[in-house]
A protein has these predicted regions:
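Extreme N-terminal starter segment of soluble prokaryotic enzymes
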Residues: 4-9
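A donor-sugar binding/catalytic signature common to diverse glycosyltransferases
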Residues: 309-353
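Conserved donor-binding/catalytic core segment of Leloir-type glycosyltransferases
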Residues: 243-257
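Short, charged/polar "capping" segments at the starts of alpha-helices
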Residues: 44-52, 128-129, 149-150, 258-260, ...
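Short acidic-hydrophobic, aromatic-tinged amphipathic segments that line or gate anion-handling sites
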Residues: 63-67, 299-305, 355-361
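Catalytic donor nucleotide-activated moiety binding site of glycosyltransferases and closely related
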Residues: 253, 274-304
Length: 362
């Protein structure tokens, strides 16, 4: 392990996490020369050559890759993750599960996290949160996605039943609960407090719009160079050659529903707009539906990058950006944001699958 005193590190699981971390550091360096480190977890996301591009950009001091381990990779850990039939037995085994899942990460942590002044973790519900709990390392949690607490109160949904007892056990460090409830979580950062279902008392608000407003033209160019691996190709696809003068509509896909239902859902959206608009599809990184094959009359942007970086591309504009449940604010490249929401999704799958927070307070 390497050791780094008196600085900070960001732990990221998605391109969006890395994007926000870069934005934060670009803003910080307007007033400070001290650089942070960044750690990219490979557990659920393929970052491709992002590490190399981050290193070239020089925004961070060091860039680490983290081979984070899910509980299912260990028979011992999973042996303590079985329903014992009553809440007392389940919570007793959960104490052991919490410790073992944290311990499972130890050989794979690439730097000494206890040496940092500030540890920032996006999506601390992943095993890294258990590691920090196991090692008693204090950290700052950051919301997984923009206003993600609006549709999924992650901590409450993952801890249905005996919530006050579980919360008390987490406060003692016996079990781990994400999103601000861990004994070792200093604070839980969100974009907008009012956009969340419920929040822990240590919540802090840092609006992403305020961060974005502090970026310089040079900062925007740095973001484009970091997050667009094939910048010229992507920009060419987005802007086109000028021969199609119809209004531009961008559809953001998501890995919703079963594959056949997803095809129907996004096919219906495309059908509504394709006649009178130049339709651009930006698939979610985890969406494996073959949009090029299914919808050949659209422009499909397959490169993996956070949607937010589109606002950093000079000269790129669309008339509408359309989302089903992805939360969108401050989308500067779009004249209009169309958010279809849960009522639209209800038409395609059982509402109980995606309406996760509505029964929590009943």
């Amino acid at each position: 392990m390497s050791k780094r005193d008196n600085t900070r590190i960001y732990i990221c699981h998605t391109y969006y996490h890395a994007y926000i971390a870069v934005v934060k550091e670009l803003v910080k360096r307007h007033t400070s020369d001290a650089k942070a480190d960044i750690m990219l977890s490979t557990m659920s996301n393929d970052f491709g050559k992002l590490k190399e591009r981050l290193e070239r950009a020089g925004v961070f001091d060091r860039v680490f890759m983290f081979d984070e381990k899910e509980d299912v990779t260990s028979e011992e850990v999973m042996s303590y993750h079985r329903d014992k039939g009553n809440i007392v037995a389940n919570l007793l085994q959960r104490i052991t599960y919490t410790k073992l899942l944290g311990k499972l990460q130890e050989p794979h942590i690439p730097t000494d996290l206890s040496a940092y002044r500030d540890v920032y973790v996006f999506c601390d519900s992943d095993p890294i949160g258990y590691y920090l709990n196991y090692k008693k390392i204090r950290y700052h949690a950051i919301e997984d996605g923009l206003n993600s607490g609006r549709l999924d109160d992650q901590a409450r949904n993952a801890n249905r039943g005996a919530w006050p007892l579980k919360r008390a056990m987490a406060a003692l460090g016996l079990i781990f609960i994400e999103s601000g409830y861990s004994r070792y979580c200093i604070d839980y950062e969100v974009n907008d407090i009012s956009a969340n279902h419920s929040l822990p008392p240590n919540v802090v608000e840092e609006p992403r719009e305020e961060l974005g407003n502090k970026l310089t033209p040079e900062d925007h160019a740095i973001l484009v160079n970091i997050f667009l691996e094939n910048k010229d190709s992507v920009v060419s696809q987005l802007i086109g050659d000028g021969s199609d003068t119809r209004p531009q509509v961008m559809i953001l896909t998501e890995p919703l529903c079963e594959m056949d239902v997803r095809k129907k859902l996004f096919g219906d959206i495309i059908d509504e707009y394709k006649e009178d608009n130049r339709v651009i599809i930006k698939p979610h990184p985890r969406d494996v539906l073959d949009y090029e094959k299914e919808f050949p009359d659209t422009i499909v942007i397959r490169d993996k990058f956070p949607m937010e970086v589109l606002g950093d591309i000079e000269g790129f504009k669309v008339d509408k950006v359309i989302s089903v449940i992805t939360q969108m604010e401050n989308v500067y490249f779009a004249k209009e944001i169309v958010y279809l929401g849960l009522d639209f999704l209800d038409k395609y799958e059982d509402p109980s699958i995606h309406r996760k927070t509505e029964n929590l307070d009943k």
